[in-house]
């Protein structure tokens, strides 16, 4: 018989920088999960990602207090801000434009996010990322 699932925990943790401090410690501690074991496994799995980029993770906790986790790709908004050299998007995206991204940058982001997107092909993925860029107040060149 399969192990009984007791909780799903969704967090955003900086790649290769997980530690027992909030938000990781309290979220895992209340379910009885070994926090240091998770931190070591997460840091090992995210070695290939640029350190410090927020990485979404879904942790499945079982009744025997064991766990498994799945990492997702960095959010598109973070990658777009990095590509445009910004710290935040526009407070009024329809009227105040704060930066510009090119089609080549959108294609790079779409390739990085491709596993998590539901787009049928790369062109649809680029259009999805372009829509996210516009909603952040970025001008999109070449789309």
Swiss-Prot record:
Gene3D superfamilies on file: Ribosomal protein L11, C-terminal domain, Ribosomal protein L11/L12, N-terminal domain
Tagged with keyword Ribonucleoprotein: yes
GO cellular component: cytosolic large ribosomal subunit
PROSITE patterns per UniProt: RIBOSOMAL_L11 (PS00359)
InterPro entries (alphabetical): Ribosomal_uL11 (IPR000911), Ribosomal_uL11_bac-typ (IPR006519), Ribosomal_uL11_C (IPR020783), Ribosomal_uL11_C_sf (IPR036769), Ribosomal_uL11_CS (IPR020785), Ribosomal_uL11_N (IPR020784), Ribosomal_uL11_N_sf (IPR036796)
Keyword line: Methylation, Ribonucleoprotein, Ribosomal protein, RNA-binding, rRNA-binding
Role according to the record: Forms part of the ribosomal stalk which helps the ribosome interact with GTP-bound translation factors.
Subunit structure: Part of the ribosomal stalk of the 50S ribosomal subunit. Interacts with L10 and the large rRNA to form the base of the stalk. L10 forms an elongated spine to which L12 dimers bind in a sequential fashion forming a multimeric L10(L12)X complex.
Protein name as it appears in the record: Large ribosomal subunit protein uL11
Species of the source: Pseudomonas savastanoi pv. phaseolicola (strain 1448A / Race 6) (Pseudomonas syringae pv. phaseolicola (strain 1448A / Race 6))
Gene name as annotated: rplK
């Amino acid at each position: 018989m399969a192990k009984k699932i007791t909780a799903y925990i969704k967090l955003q943790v900086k790649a290769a920088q997980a530690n027992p401090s909030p938000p990781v410690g309290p979220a895992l501690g209340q379910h009885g999960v070994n926090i240091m074991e998770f931190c070591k496994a997460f840091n090992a799995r995210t070695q290939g990602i640029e350190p410090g980029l927020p990485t979404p993770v879904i942790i499945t906790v079982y009744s025997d207090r064991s766990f498994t986790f799945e990492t997702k790709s960095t959010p598109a908004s973070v990658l777009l801000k990095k590509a445009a050299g910004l710290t935040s998007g526009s407070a009024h995206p329809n009227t105040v434009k704060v930066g510009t991204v090119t089609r080549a940058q959108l294609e790079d982001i779409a390739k990085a996010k491709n596993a998590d997107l539901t787009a049928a092909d790369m062109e649809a993925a680029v259009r999805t990322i372009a829509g996210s860029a516009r909603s952040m107040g970025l001008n999109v060149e070449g789309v």
